[in-house]
Amino acid sequence: MSTEETKKEQALQNYRDRLIEHKNAELRLNKAHELIKKLKKDFQKTEDHIKTIQYIGEIIGEVLRSLDEERFIVKACNGPRYVVRCANYQDKAHLLVPGARVTLDLTTLTILKILPREVDPIIFNMTAESPGSVSYGEIGGLSNQIRELREVVELPLMIPELFIRVGIKAPKGVLLYGPPGTGKTLLARAIASNLEANFLKVVSSAIVDKYIGESARVIREMFGYARDHQPCVIFMDEIDAIGGRRFSEGTSADREIQRTLMELLNQMDGFDTLSKVKIIMATNRPDVLDPALLRPGRLDRKIEIPLPNEAGRVDVLKIHAANITKHGDVDYEAIAKLADGFNAADLRNVCTEAGMFAIRAERDYVMEEDFMKAVRKCQEAKKLEGKLDYQKV
């Protein structure tokens, strides 16, 4: 082998060695970068822990009034009142109104932050319940009632200028009344599901408290929360629990319920007609409600949710039977004729019972005969129910 070839081979070997060294150096560099990144993250975490340990708490207070542009009288949570100044006043001037909750520095008592209003946990529980996904197409036989309800609740929230142009005041609230099982709560859930608004679901019986004044306070906080989180829809189910007719005699519990009703009447008069707070009430006993609650200006529209007629029963049956595995044709009209006097909940029960008959027969599909058997079975159960008679509101 010549000298030139030897030199060439040696140069190639050196090049290969250098390439391997370069690759190894790159790997070491990448590992070093990863280590630096991890150390930085650990350093930041340690810094946060140190800040948390060294953090000095703040006092919560309430603004009573402003003395001038920069000084405020604030009542601290532990009792004393102070004249204080505000850090970054220009950014917070419009929020420092009487009643605003603020945090104060422990040493200088300077206003540092503005807190949201205090909300009772009961109110948060009202907002936590999800209405679910309910479309108007899932409600059968109530097209007129849906239109009337949407006119009262949706239009003022979505297109308020329409009422200003026409020159009328938007309705404040609506009462849904009718026999049990006709879809009053389902209508409210559909409104909540299809409307981009906050939704408070209130069970009226849960508001009543054994301590005097507590029930009225919950009503005040409920409407206060609704005003702060507009647009908001308040749905009060079983309103007859607190909205019953007032009378002079009664126990202390009856008087507490009457005080709760008076607070509700006061709050319903309180908010502006075109504000984005609407109230829906539901009951199956409209005859026991107080006349002051029913008057226009509080509940402007009363919508009766009646038992479905034959066409309505067919619609409801088709909606509930849509997801059922069926074999052969099903004559919904014949089933609806047999189900005279049934409400929507009964018709849903008919579909469930039809499925149970199919399971009992060890089938994975439902036939028309199962629906007929289910209707007859539900008719026997309906005989146990009492009939509720009341006049239209």
Curated annotation (Swiss-Prot):
What SUPFAM superfamilies is this protein classified in? P-loop containing nucleoside triphosphate hydrolases (SSF52540)
The entry's localization annotation reads: Cytoplasm; Nucleus
Matching entries from InterPro entries are given as: 26S_Proteasome_ATPase, AAA+_ATPase, AAA_lid_3, ATPase_AAA_core, ATPase_AAA_CS, NA-bd_OB-fold, P-loop_NTPase, Prot_ATP_ID_OB_2nd
| Keywords assigned | ATP-binding, Cytoplasm, Nucleotide-binding, Nucleus, Proteasome
Write out the GO biological process terms.
Answer: ERAD pathway; positive regulation of RNA polymerase II transcription preinitiation complex assembly; proteasome-mediated ubiquitin-dependent protein catabolic process
Name the SMART domains for this protein. AAA
User: Which family does the UniProt entry place this protein in?
Assistant: Belongs to the AAA ATPase family.
Entry protein name: 26S proteasome regulatory subunit 10B
What is the native source organism of this protein? Dictyostelium discoideum
